[in-house]
Amino acid sequence: MARKKVDKPVKEMLVIFVEGDADEIIINRLLDHYRSNGWKYESDIKLKNTHGFPDEKKIKAYLTTIIETMSEKIIKFKAVCCEYDTDVFEKGTKQRPDWEKIGNNLRDNYGVNEFCRIEAKTSIEDWMLDDSEGLLKVLHLPLNTNIKGMSGQDKVKSLFRKKNIMYDRSKGKSTIKKYLDNLDISKIANNRKVELKDFENILGVKNNDE
């Protein structure tokens, strides 16, 4: 007697790629901020820190790993989002990827329903400085401290340096997390609405001004 075919359960998933530890902390805090304001997401969310620019090769490798390690289920990628700093493109040190082509490839090869980019302009440190007062407070620096630096990253590094703390945005989670966790994330969410628009649309976040 033929064995009855058992259909695999379907697991829907949103995958978010970030390029460093600081980015991972901030994006996770944004998700918590949305949840605290009543947002719910029915599918699983996986956040992958690629410790470097989340290019197509890294994206595909991780999606493949998910499929292979969860082979007992049918994985449906509701969306894939990539977060990265824009400074490398603005400086001309890196060529902009063909994001439309990447999105189409992910759709064709992995069934990704939606693809979006979260561009941190000019860097995730610029986002952090949206609450410069909070950063000064958590570092126990005077609120009138002159924040020096040519870029957001330089400015944040200089503030941590004043307290003899090594700021490593890529692999320094154990050191920087307690400081970034004390920033007022609502200031970032409100000040970066343009950069977060597509991300929030995919998440289904409802804004008070809508």
Regions found by a protein language model. Name each.
Residues 51-63:
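Charged, often glycine-rich, active-site loop that binds/positions anionic groups
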